[in-house]
């Protein structure tokens, strides 16, 4: 059966969405192509019609993860006032909902350690996503007058990612909540975001 190019593109997108979810949940080394294909409603045999290898799938799924993150934050980017934009990012990123949605949240706190050990091409792709997020954070920082908004965005992103990663990693729910709340309070105070909501 020959499928239209539109059908093939939709199928490929479905596989990428499932792969992105699975990689976030289990890490790139612990996912199985057969399982991803089954969750996408396809057979394992159809995989190679869409991807050359598991590594190629992982590389493209990274792009899907960052595109999902961009789509979720588009409303925040459009908020206008730079303090409100920054506060909205911080509120979302350091929320219990984001902490608890490992399979749908930002890939940085979940996968940074995994991709640090990946092939150079995969790390480069992940790095492109990191730069994209940092660049979006740099916009309100520049509007707030930070001379080196790029450097400031790197520091802010590292604190956000670290806060969520540690909150996810600890076994004590109270400590996890405290990690989020304390990181949030520190960032809000540092950037003067108390009144911005």
What does each model-identified segment do?
Residues 120-128, 141-197:
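Hydrophobic/aromatic-rich alpha-helical bundle segments in the mid-to-C-terminal region
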Residues 14, 18-25, 72-75, 159-166:
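Solvent-exposed, amphipathic alpha-helical segments
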Residues 12, 16, 33, 44, ...:
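Alpha-helical structural signal
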Residues 1-10, 194-197:
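N-terminal intrinsically disordered/low-complexity leader segments
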Residues 60, 74-105, 153-156:
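Hydrophobic alpha-helical connector segments
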Residues 63-69:
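Short, basic, alpha-helical segments at the C-terminal edge of helix-turn-helix-like DNA-binding modules
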Residues 85-88, 99-127:
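Amphipathic alpha-helical segments used for helix-helix packing
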Residues 14, 21-56, 60:
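Helix-turn-helix
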């Amino acid at each position: 059966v020959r499928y239209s190019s539109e059908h093939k593109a939709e199928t490929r997108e479905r596989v990428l969405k499932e792969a992105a979810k699975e990689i976030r949940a289990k890490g790139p080394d612990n996912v199985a192509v057969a399982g991803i294909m089954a969750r996408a409603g396809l057979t394992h045999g159809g995989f190679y019609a869409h991807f050359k290898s598991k590594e190629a799938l992982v590389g493209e799924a990274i792009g899907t993860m960052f595109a999902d993150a961009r789509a979720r934050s588009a409303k925040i980017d459009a908020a206008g006032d730079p303090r409100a934009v920054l506060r909205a990012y911080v509120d979302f990123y350091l929320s219990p909902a984001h902490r608890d949605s490992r399979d749908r949240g930002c890939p940085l706190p979940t996968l940074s350690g995994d991709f640090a050990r990946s092939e150079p091409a995969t790390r480069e792709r992940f790095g492109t996503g990191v730069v994209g997020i940092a660049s979006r954070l740099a916009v309100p920082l520049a509007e707030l007058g930070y001379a080196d908004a790029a450097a400031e965005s790197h520091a802010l992103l590292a604190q956000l990612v670290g806060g969520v990663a540690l909150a996810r990693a600890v076994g004590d729910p109270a400590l996890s909540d405290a990690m989020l709340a304390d990181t949030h309070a520190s960032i809000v105070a540092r950037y003067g975001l108390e009144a911005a909501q």
